Amino acid sequence: MVSRRNYAAITAVMVIIFFLFQFLNMAKDHWNDYSENQYAVDVNELSGADNVYVASDSDELDQQSTGLIPWAKKKCVVCIGSNESNTMGEMIGNWALYMKRKISYYESISAYENAISKKTQDTPQFVLVDPDFINWDDTKQIRSLQTCVENGISVIFGKLPDASIIESHKLLRRLLGIDEIVQESVTGNGIHLYSGFLLGGEAIYKADTDEEEKNQDMDLVFPWYHLTNGTKIYMKGMLEDSEIDVQKYPPLIWRKNFTTASVFAVIGDYMTDATGLGMLTAMLCEMQSYTVYPVVNAQNFIAANYPGMANENTAVLRQMYSQTMRGLFRDVVWPAFSSINIKTSFLLSSMMTMQFDYADAAKPNSDDVQYYMEAVNEEEGEMGYSVYSVSDTSVSEKLSEDEVFWKSTLPDYKFASFYVGESSDEEIQEALDSKFLQQIRTVVKGIDDTSDVIGYINNQVTKQNALIDGYEHTFRQNLRIRSVETALGYTSILADISRAAYPQSDEDGWEKLSEKLMANTITYWKPFSVFSGTTVSQSDSRIRRFLSLNYEEVANESNNKILIHASEGDETAWFVLRTNGEVISDVAGGTYEEIEDNVWLIGMEESSILITLKPSNTLFYYE
């Protein structure tokens, strides 16, 4: 039997616990100020397209004496064959912009040689060759590439000419490090990416199950070469025949070392889209004893067309989910997003569509706005705006209706981010010109194969391309993710909820979509968890800093010190440092965190930072 004293004590404890819970809920509601958007600012006060740094001959920073060696300008790069409008030429142009390098284009090797002889072209660090624009019948052009290597200029073949051309030119085979052409074409059953080239480690792109076969979108038909001594393979094809020595598998990406420079070869079309950004960066790192380069450091997760504020498509949703759209979004979809937020470093950028169908009778309900705004805010996410609709409604009509609803519901909240999907440039600009969206600072575009991953859509508004569909993860997409993470420290996952809201088949059911989404986001980005999870507006701030950044570096390798001096900015400047076995012992003026072996993320908190390295205790075997 409980005594009166114990009963009173138990009652008092229960009352205290009750009021504590009540107080916590009240405090949470009080502190959760969702009525105003912290990211919505006057975009004219932000760094704009006019501030983007483009490398030139006269680049100079406000330099001070280093006590090491004189500051040296970053070497330029050259593209032969492709121009800015070709896919490979466009890719290296974007790479040069992101890496703060000056780039020159030449239609032929002879045009490049002419510029060198007239001294109108500085000696580049490397030359990227697009073989589609080279006359291989002219052996003088091959000798010219050999001369480049002899003069200390590395040569990158963005892809290789046909095996028949290579077979007919002994000098070209010697330049590429090809000893024997085994077969002009062979069909493999997978591709092996070695560790230490792209960030993310080793990868085997081979389908061992029927389910994995759905992910196999790599080109598995390639020529088969045997290489000479002095070559290093970064990626190779895999063959079905188990009797073939693995060391003799067909190489797909490799380097041939010469005394003065290197020649890199790529088989396939990997250098024509964003995948090429990371591959060029990895090759640059292979040319140098250490490499420091700027990155964005932003990882985005975008829930496009979520939430919706109108109860639409009810008959279809009841049949598939036994739910209305309101129930689907609140009770089924939201828990999945909350779980991703907990289990990963991603922050949620939710792109609201107030209505999907403007032709039906359903209208948006203001009662749900508070729920979603509070929920997203509690997860430290951001609520943006989507222009998407399923009805034949013009952009101006949609904006007009949405503005009326929003002004009567949450008038003080101004949208700062804008999901445009596949909208045309004219439609995007029409929306940005509207009063309703006057504080938009960044636009999120749909998934595109272009290498133009980030940039400006107009003078004051940035653009961020979605890189990957969260509901699928093919082998080629995985390679693309690794490449963009290597080059930019950036990713952008897109989960379009309109598929679940307006399903076209059972494959669009949320149960199947969420299963894939959870597996993909939790699994494939683990190697890149050091990079920061951001909302798209936070990412926007980092993109502006990244694009406006100018920096210079100087090193005294005998003392294992690297000094970096950068242009000033409101945001932290982020860099990746890759070494050949050394590890960081100290960073004065900044922070550092290891991404993987020999790779660090550097945060630059002052205008100059000094990195001190030391030998690693790990044994390394050099080729």
Segments and roles (model prediction):
Residues 75, 123, 215-298:
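A glycine-centered loop/beta-turn motif at secondary-structure junctions
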Residues 77-81, 149-151, 157-180, 308-311, ...:
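Metal-dependent polysaccharide deacetylase catalytic core of the NodB/CE4 family, i.e.
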Residues 81-163:
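Helical hinge/lid and interdomain linker segments adjacent to catalytic or ligand-binding clefts
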Residues 136-207:
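A glycine-rich, often tryptophan-bearing local segment used as a flexible ligand/cofactor-contacting loop or short
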Residues 139-140, 596-623:
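C-terminal beta-strand-rich structural cap/linker in extracellular carbohydrate-active enzymes
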Residues 214-224, 562-583:
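Surface-exposed beta-strand/loop patches in extracellular or lumenal glycoproteins
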Residues 268-375:
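Active-site beta->alpha N-cap acidic-glycine motif
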Residues 268-269, 290-310, 341, 409-413, ...:
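Catalytic grooves of carbohydrate-active enzymes
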